[in-house]
Each structure stands twice: as C-alpha cells, then as structure tokens.
Amino acid sequence: MKNIKNQSQEVKEPDLTGTYTARDYISWKAEELMELIHGRISRMAPGPSRGHQEIVMILGTVLYTHFRSKCKVYPAPMDVYLIHPNEDWKETKNIVQPDICVICDPAKLHDRGCMGAPDLVVEILSPGTAAKDLGPKRDLYEEYGVKELWIVHPVEGTIALHLLENGKYKILPIYAKGKTLQSPTFPDLKVDLDAVFADE
C-alpha cells in the first residue's frame, strides 16, 4: 500500500480488498473520488462526457428552480451516507455520490454531506457506471428509502422513474423525447424531455 502524508499525520491509502465504514472513509486522504458499497471501495469512473455534464446542468437547473427554498439540490460530488434510523452515520458501510440528489429534510444536511436517504436521486448512465447504477446503487436506494429514483439514459433519450412503494421500487412507464415527465412524489414538478436531450 502506498503512503501519503497530510500535515504531520501519515495516512495509508485504503486496501481495495478490505471492508470499511464511514469512520474509515473520512480518514482517507486519497485524491480520487470513491464510493463505499457494502463496505467495499468502488472507484468513481473517469471524468464524465460533455453530454453527461450538460444533462446534469439542465436537470440540476430545473430542479433548483422548482424547489427553491423548499428543498436542497446538489450535483456530484456530494457524499450521501445511507443510514438506517438510529444508526451512527460513522458506522455505515454505504456512501454514494449520486449525479444529482434532492434533500427536503434539513436535519439530514451535514457539513460532510447528506446523512440519510435523499427524497429524489438522479443517476445518468454512462458506459463506466451503468452496471453499478442499475445494480447495487439502485438496490441501496431502495433499501434505505429514496422515495424516487430517475435513471437517465442519454443514448436512448429516456428517463425511467422508480417509485418507492411499500419498501420496493415500482418502475413506471419510461419517458422519452416528446414527453413531459411528471414526478409522482412532487406532482408540481414537470420536466420537458425535449429540453433535457436537446443536444443528444
């Protein structure tokens, strides 16, 4: 393992074969972005494409404009510590960085990120992240109670809504270009998909 120094303290970069908690995560000084999924390190993909970032900007602007002071909207990188009720956040083994998250409970906001499930998460698929976004991360969002998950497919020009009902995600009809997405969790929130995928 490689050693790196921060001020007067020497910290080892994490062993990729180990299992860790948030307590370990916040002690690392590694420069690259990473997530913890079931205690295992998952490195973030290299810098996203221009198209990916344009969609982040468009959807982020729509969400920010809609929610204003009612909820907070954050793009990645934003650490989301997925914790169960009464669980010490430092003991969680699941820390993710959604492309966009919406948090309506101010009690979940912390200097380090979000402590608990956001109300709405947006994940934008790319070749390097699709398997993780559609697999373990989706399952974690379901387990920890993210009310609504948007899976954006830039190549197909679609958004799939996953709505949490009785602890399980129900996949709603897919929205495509020419359609207007309406959030079931936030009925006043509508998104024109032609605007989202204008350059795709």
Label each PLM-derived region with a short phrase.
Residues M1-E200:
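Gly/Pro/Ser/Thr-rich low-complexity, intrinsically disordered segments predominantly at protein N-termini
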